[in-house]
Amino acid sequence: MGDKKSPTRPKRQPKPSSDEGYWDCSVCTFRNSAEAFKCMMCDVRKGTSTRKPRPVSQLVAQQVTQQFVPPTQSKKEKKDKVEKEKSEKETTSKKNSHKKTRPRLKNVDRSSAQHLEVTVGDLTVIITDFKEKTKSPPASSAASADQHSQSGSSSDNTERGMSRSSSPRGEASSLNGESH
């Protein structure tokens, strides 16, 4: 009674394949070498099944209800955030409304103000021109400073532009000084 074999059930035979040195990943179908324990593309272990588990109906119902609830709350939260930001902006603008501060340049000598009035049609604009602060004035910048104080005509603007570009720091400093 020791030899019980079922004649109807054949033995499992390995697949006849020409590529014995490789295995195909069950997830990404990448062909890996036989020595590889994990897939070289997706790091899935060799022999991992791709069968998806059946969803539990209670869990699915719970997840579905959670998906629909957060959007309504997030809209309220967004609305509250927007209102809060608006109120903060209003309070900051109210605080700053009583004193208007103009942006100030740090590299400007305020004592060297020169005012120039330009009128076009019925509009008059006053341009206040300041000299740059220099830590140690070289001979070339001192000469350009003399040109500033001597000239007072409307062609003064072109001379100023040229004298600024000949400053020791070059054109970059004059651009930075004027753009702010």
From Swiss-Prot:
Localization of this protein: Nucleus
Biased composition (Basic residues): 95-105
Annotated zinc fingers (RanBP2-type), start-end: 19-48
UniProt biased composition (Low complexity): 62-73, 136-156, 163-174
Annotated spans, Disordered: 1-24, 47-120, 132-180
Biased composition (Basic and acidic residues): 74-93
Predominant location category: nucleus
UniProt GO cellular component terms: cytosol; nucleoplasm; nucleus
Keywords: Metal-binding, Nucleus, Phosphoprotein, Transcription, Transcription regulation, Zinc, Zinc-finger
Superkingdom per UniProt: Eukaryota
Subunit annotation: Interacts with MYC, MYCN, RNF2/RING1B and YY1. Part of the E2F6.com-1 complex in G0 phase composed of E2F6, MGA, MAX, TFDP1, CBX3, BAT8, EUHMTASE1, RING1, RNF2, MBLR, L3MBTL2 and YAF2.
Function: Binds to MYC and inhibits MYC-mediated transactivation. Also binds to MYCN and enhances MYCN-dependent transcriptional activation. Increases calpain 2-mediated proteolysis of YY1 in vitro. Component of the E2F6.com-1 complex, a repressive complex that methylates 'Lys-9' of histone H3, suggesting that it is involved in chromatin-remodeling.
Protein known as: YY1-associated factor 2
Organism, as annotated: Homo sapiens (Human)
